[in-house]
C-alpha cells in the first residue's frame, strides 16, 4: 500500500518508542565488529559481538506493526526504523534526523534484561528484534493497547524536540504512575498515559547526562575516508591440465564437491511453507530434490502474481580476478532468476553484500576493482540498479598455532540477491524434465565457445597434475561476463520462448559446469541422459572436460523436438546462435553417457552419479542426525525406479460442498485462535473464509481480557507457529496458560462438550490441544508427541492417504493421497 511506504515527519512532543525485545550484552559492536579483524579486538568484545535471535519476539513485534498498518490512514506510526548496527545509538538519532528534530532520551526507560549494563552498553548493544518509532502523544495509549494484546514489550524512551539536539541520560523523563506495576513487561507497558517530557534544563536531582550534543555533530559532513592500496602480483596458481584427467573420475569428483553436491541436509531442517504463499521452494518434482534455481512467492491468496528471488556468488574466482568474480555473481543471480516469468528486465532489482579483508595488502584494491566493475560498468550496461546492500570488511582472522602467529584471509566476496515481480507463478520453469514429450536439451553458453577453467570446481578437485603437489590446479583465466548484451539477450530469449510454449524445463549453468546442470536435471526427473558434444550448429568440437566442466555463464533448456526449428530461429533472432548447442537427449535408461560423434567417451550408472552427488548430505546427516535415518533416506533417494510423490484425489476439488449449507446467507463463525509468536493465522483464516466461514482473529489475550468468548463461535482453530519456543513440546506452554486459569479452563471445557462445534489444532496448536486431552471428551487415549527417529526437525512433503474417518474435515475423501507439508 503506497500510503504506508512513505514516512511522515515527527513533530516536537511526539513520543520516541522502543518496540521489541529487551537490551542485553549481545551484539555489542556487532555491526562495528564485523569490520574489525577477529583477534584485533579484546576477548570481551569478541564474546559480546556474538548475535543471538528470538524469533518469537520478532513475531510479536511484527504483529504490532501489522495491526498499525491495518489501520490504513489511521496508522499511529509516524516513522519507524529497525535497530541494527550500532543499536539505539544509530537507530534513534537517524529516526530524529530524518524529521529534522532533536530528542531527549531517557536510558532508564529502555527495557533491559541485564541490570548491570552501562550507559554505553545500553545505548550501543545490538540486541535484535527491536524497532524505534515515533508516535503522537495523543495516540500512545492506543498503541499501548495493541502491544498489550500482542504481549509485545515496548517503552516510551524519549520525546522529539524542536531544537536539533540529542540529549541522552537518566532521569530525563517524568516517572510512570506509582501503580504502573512491575516486571520487565510491566515496566515496558507502564507510564504510557503520562506524556514524557524533558526535566527542566536537563539537570537537577536524579538526572545523569551521558550525551548532550547538536545533531550536526552526528550528521554533519565528516571527511571522506582515503585509502591507499596497490594491486598485488598475480597469483601463481598452477593451471589444470585436462589432458591428464580421466572423464569418468572427473564427473564423480565434481558432483561430490560441496559446492555442487546436494544440500538437502541444510534445507529439510527449515520450514519452507509457512505463510501459505510459497509457490517455488528449493525442492523440485515428485522426488523432492534440491535443484531449484530461484524462490517464488505469491503476492496474495487470490491471484497468480508473485515475486521471485535468486542469489548469485562466485567468490573463488576472486583469487584470480576480483572484477570477473563480481560480474559473474551478478550474472549468476540473473540466470537463476530467468526461470521465473518476469515481464521485463527493468523490473529486476539487486541487493549486494560485499565482504573483504579491508587493510590486508592488495585486498582494498581488489575490492575497488570489484565495486567499479559492477557499480560503474556492468549494472549501467544492463540498466539494473542496486538500491540496497550491506558490507562486512573484517574477513580475516588472527590466531596462534604451535606458538606461531597465523592469519586466515578470505577473498573479496560479492553475494548478489535479485528480486522481481512475477506475472504468473504458474509459468515458472524448473529443472524437472518432461517425460511425455520427445525432447532435446540445448545449452546457451554466454561464453560463446570460450571454456576458461580458472577457479572451476574441476580445478579444485585435482592437485597440480605436473608435480602432484597438494596445491589445486586452480589457475588460468577465470570465466567472465565479457558481453553484457548476451545476458540481456538470454533473458529475452527465455521470456519469448516461454510465451511461445517452446520450453519445457530450465536450469542455469554454474558450479560444476554443464555436466552438473545436466545431472541435476536427470536426478530430479529420474531419467538418463545421452550427452553429445558434437551438437554445435557450426560443427565446433573441443576438449570434452573443458566443454563439460567450464563454468561460464549459461543455461540448459528442454525443447520439444518438433519445435527445434522454431526455437533455433528464435535463438538466431536474439543474436545467440554462436552460443547455442544441442547437448543432450533424455532417456528412460538409468545411464548417463557422454559421446562425441560415434565414440562413447564415458558412461556412468545413474545410481553411481547420484551417490556422488548425495555424498555430502549423507555424511552430514550421519554426523548430525540419526545415522540409521540418513542411511535409509539415501537408499530410498538413490532408487532410479522409486515412484516419488503420486497424488490421487477421490473427490472433485472444485466442488463447493459448503454451498448448500450457506444458501441462506448465514456463515458459521470460526475463531482463528493464536498465542504470542504464532505465525500462520492469516493463511488459516483465508482457508476458512474460502470454505464459507466468517473468520475472526482471536488472540489468547482477548480471551483472558473477556473481549471474546468461545461460546460465540461454531468452531476454533489453534494455529501453528513458535509460541513458547520453536521446539517439540512448546505447545505445553500454551496449554498451561489455559489449564492454570480457571475461567479459560471452564470456557474450553464447555466448548469441547458441545455437540454443535468443532476444533482443529495445527502444528504447535496441535501440540497444545494434545495437552488439553484431560478436558476433551473421548480424548483420554490420545497419543503424546514424541521425538522423531531422525532426532531433527523435518520439513518435507509427506504423501498421506486418507482413511475412513468420522471427522467432518475428511468426509468424502477416503482413499485420496495428498502431499502434506
What kind of region is each of these model predictions?
Residues 97-102, 304, 521-525, 682-698:
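Short helix-loop-beta junction
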Residues 341, 785-821:
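An acidic, glycine-rich "communication" segment
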Amino acid at each position: 500500500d503506497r500510503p504506508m511506504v512513505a514516512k511522515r515527519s515527527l513533530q516536537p512532543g511526539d513520543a520516541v518508542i522502543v518496540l521489541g525485545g529487551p537490551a542485553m550484552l549481545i551484539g555489542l559492536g556487532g555491526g562495528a565488529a564485523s569490520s574489525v579483524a577477529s583477534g584485533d579486538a579484546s576477548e570481551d568484545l569478541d564474546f559480546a559481538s556474538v548475535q543471538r535471535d528470538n524469533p518469537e519476539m520478532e513475531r510479536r513485534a511484527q504483529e504490532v506493526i501489522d495491526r498499525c498498518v491495518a489501520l490504513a490512514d489511521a496508522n499511529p506510526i509516524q516513522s519507524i526504523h529497525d535497530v541494527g548496527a550500532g543499536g539505539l545509538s544509530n537507530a534513534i538519532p537517524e529516526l530524529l534526523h530524518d524529521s529534522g528534530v532533536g530528542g531527549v532520551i531517557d536510558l532508564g526507560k529502555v527495557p533491559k534484561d541485564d541490570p548491570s549494563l552501562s550507559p554505553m552498553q545500553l545505548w550501543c548493544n545490538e540486541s535484535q528484534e527491536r524497532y524505534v518509532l515515533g508516535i503522537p502523544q495523543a495516540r500512545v495509549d492506543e498503541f499501548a493497547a495493541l502491544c498489550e494484546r500482542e504481549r509485545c514489550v515496548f517503552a516510551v524512551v524519549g520525546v522529539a524536540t524542536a531544537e536539533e539536539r540529542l540529549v541522552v541520560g537518566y532521569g530525563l523523563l517524568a516517572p510512570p504512575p506509582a501503580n504502573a506495576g512491575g516486571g520487565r513487561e510491566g515496566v515496558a507497558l507502564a507510564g504510557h498515559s503520562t506524556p514524557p517530557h524533558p526535566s527542566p534544563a536537563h539537570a537537577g536531582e536524579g538526572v545523569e547526562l551521558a550525551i548532550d550534543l547538536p545533531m550536526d555533530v552526528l550528521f554533519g559532513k565528516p571527511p571522506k575516508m582515503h585509502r591507499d592500496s596497490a594491486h598485488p602480483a598475480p597469483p601463481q596458481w598452477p593451471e589444470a591440465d585436462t589432458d591428464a584427467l580421466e572423464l569418468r573420475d572427473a564427473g564423480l569428483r565434481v558432483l561430490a564437491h560441496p559446492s555442487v553436491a546436494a544440500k538437502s541436509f541444510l534445507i529439510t531442517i527449515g520450514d519452507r511453507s509457512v505463510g501459505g504463499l510459497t509457490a517455488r521452494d528449493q525442492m523440485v518434482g515428485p522426488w523432492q530434490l534440491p535443484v531449484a534455481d530461484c524462490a517464488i512467492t505469491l503476492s496474495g491468496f487470490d491471484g497468480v502474481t508473485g515475486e521471485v528471488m535468486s542469489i548469485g556468488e562466485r567468490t573463488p574466482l576472486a583469487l584470480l580476478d576480483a572484477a570477473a568474480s563480481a560480474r559473474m555473481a551478478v550474472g549468476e543471480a540473473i540466470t537463476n532468476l530467468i526461470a521465473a516469468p518476469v515481464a521485463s528486465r527493468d523490473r529486476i532489482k539487486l541487493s549486494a553484500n560485499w565482504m573483504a579483508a579491508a587493510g590486508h595488502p592488495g585486498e582494498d584494491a581488489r575490492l575497488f576493482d570489484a565495486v567499479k566493475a559492477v557499480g560503474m560498468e556492468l549494472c549501467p550496461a544492463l540498466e539494473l540498479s542496486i538500491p540496497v546492500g550491506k558490507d562486512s570488511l573484517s574477513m580475516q582472522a588472527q590466531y596462534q598455532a604451535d606458538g606461531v602467529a597465523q592469519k586466515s584471509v578470505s577473498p573479496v566476496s560479492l553475494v548478489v540477491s535479485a528480486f522481481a515481480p512475477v506475472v504468473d507463478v504458474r509459468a515458472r520453469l524448473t529443472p524437472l524434465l518432461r517425460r511425455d514429450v520427445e525432447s532435446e536439451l540445448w545449452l546457451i553458453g554466454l561464453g560463446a565457445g570460450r571454456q576458461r577453467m580458472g577457479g572451476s570446481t574441476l580445478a579444485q578437485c585435482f592437485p597440480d597434475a605436473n608435480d602432484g603437489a597438494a596445491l589445486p590446479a586452480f589457475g588460468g583465466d577465470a570465466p567472465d561476463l565479457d558481453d553484457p548484451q548476451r545476458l540481456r539477450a538470454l533473458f529475452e530469449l527465455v521470456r519469448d520462448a516461454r510465451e511461445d510454449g517452446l520450453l519445457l524445463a530450465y536450469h542455469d549453468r554454474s558450479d560444476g559446469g554443464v555436466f552438473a546442470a545436466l545431472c541435476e536435471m536427470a536426478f530430479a526427473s529420474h531419467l538418463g541422459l545421452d550427452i553429445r558434444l558434437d551438437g554445435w550448429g557450426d560443427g565446433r568440437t573441443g576438449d570434452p572436460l573443458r566443454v563439460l566442466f567450464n563454468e561460464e555463464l549459461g543455461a540448459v533448456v528442454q525443447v520439444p523436438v518438433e519445435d527445434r526449428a522454431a526455437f533455433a530461429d528464435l535463438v538466431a533472432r536474439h543474436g545467440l546462435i554462436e552460443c547455442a548447442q544441442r547437448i543432450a537427449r533424455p532417456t528412460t535408461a538409468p545411464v548417463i553417457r557422454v559421446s562425441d560423434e560415434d565414440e562413447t567417451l564415458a558412461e556412468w550408472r545413474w545410481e553411481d552419479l547420484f551417490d556422488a552427488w548425495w555424498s555430502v548430505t549423507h555424511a552430514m546427516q550421519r554426523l548430525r542426525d540419526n545415522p540409521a535415518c540418513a542411511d535409509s533416506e539415501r537408499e530410498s533417494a538413490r532408487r532410479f525406479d522409486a515412484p516419488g510423490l503420486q497424488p490421487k484425489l477421490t473427490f472433485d476439488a472444485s466442488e463447493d460442498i459448503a454451498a448448500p449449507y450457506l444458501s441462506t446467507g448465514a456463515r458459521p463463525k470460526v475463531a482463528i485462535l493464536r498465542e504470542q509468536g504464532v505465525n500462520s493465522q492469516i493463511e488459516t483464516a483465508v482457508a476458512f473464509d474460502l470454505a464459507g466461514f466468517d473468520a475472526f482473529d482471536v488472540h489468547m489475550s482477548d480471551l483472558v481480557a473477556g473481549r471474546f468468548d468461545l461460546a460465540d463461535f461454531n468452531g476454533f482453530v489453534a494455529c501453528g507457529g513458535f509460541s513458547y519456543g520453536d521446539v517439540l513440546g512448546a505447545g505445553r506452554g500454551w496449554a498451561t496458560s489455559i489449564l492454570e486459569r480457571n475461567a479459560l479452563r471452564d470456557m474450553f471445557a464447555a466448548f469441547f462438550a458441545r455437540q454443535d462445534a468443532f476444533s482443529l489444532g495445527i502444528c504447535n496448536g496441535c501440540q497444545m490441544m494434545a495437552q488439553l486431552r484431560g478436558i476433551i471428551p473421548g480424548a483420554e487415549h490420545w497419543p503424546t508427541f514424541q521425538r522423531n527417529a531422525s532426532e531433527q526437525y523435518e520439513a518435507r512433503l509427506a504423501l498421506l492417504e486418507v482413511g475412513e474417518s468420522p471427522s467432518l474435515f475428511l468426509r468424502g475423501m477416503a482413499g485420496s493421497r495428498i502431499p502434506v507439508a
